[in-house]
Amino acid sequence: MSDLSRLALEHQRKRTELSERVARRAARLWRSVQASDIDASWDRIAPALGQVVSAGQLQAARMAAGYTSAAARAQGVAGPGQIIPEAFTGATLEGREIVPELFAAATTTKRLIGRGVGVGSAFQAGTALMSILAATTVRDSGNMADKVSGLRRGRTVQYARMVSPGACSRCAILAGVGHFTKHFERHPECRCTTVPIYSDNPNAPLPEGLYGSPADYFESLSKAEQDRIYTKAGAEAIRMGADPVSVVNARRGMFRVQQPGRLVARATPRTLVAPDGRTFQAYVTTENRMRFGSQYRVDGSRRSSSVRLMPETIISMSEGDPVRAVELLRQFGYVP
């Protein structure tokens, strides 16, 4: 395994440990909710939940500059990778505010109780969902910060997926390398991260431990691991020449997360105007102007007239120019 791959795996391990700590803290807060009045209990813990997850996002974002700087040095590339970590807090990947998203744990619990599921089992389901959402939100912020930090070197950059050890088939079929404008796809509980690759030759061989395609990743696995990840029948089909993506997608789709606890193709965008006057479709978030309270029981969110763009949308506006991408990220407050 290359030094770059080892560096990326260590970064991934630390990011995973952080997200799991945040998930445990969020779950502890959730367990204080009283079954006799879930909504009132939620209103009491909501501020603390928001603080716990936002603090985790901040820690995750602060890890980015050191990681991407080390990854760049390993490839003989210099340049600043500073970001504004605070800009990566307070919102989910899709641009929704954190606490209303976490309220899915409460709605899920209430729905199960209403269907006759025992209170204990219903709360266990709510705890599991709370843990998933909290951890995913932290990992997403870290991945966005990694991507933004990796751009700040005035070089053409691609991002290789560092597939998490023990990954599932949905992650395995996303192994590969893509242009920096490509969205980072993932599912709930995905632990994969990215590695910035600096090369003027997009066809240059990747360092050992990184894979250019789902097929390359499949070939790197032992037969036992192939069977575990893709199922015995699926793995045998791939060994006989079937496309790994087709085999996995025949069983289940791969989508980005939109609403808590379910998978959808893409969040609904809004039309916004950039500082240079161009209009575009964007995934946005409000600027923390909601109040904790009954709105969570109505529709799970509260929108304001103020919005800010998420990094992936801003990067997509750059038309493939990394210098332009950094300029836009600076305009929107993600880099100094």
Tell where the protein language model's regions lie, with residue ranges.
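Acidic/histidine-rich catalytic cores and adjacent linkers
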Residues: 189
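Domain-core detector
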Residues: 1-186, 197-336
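Glycine-rich, flexible loop motifs
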Residues: 192
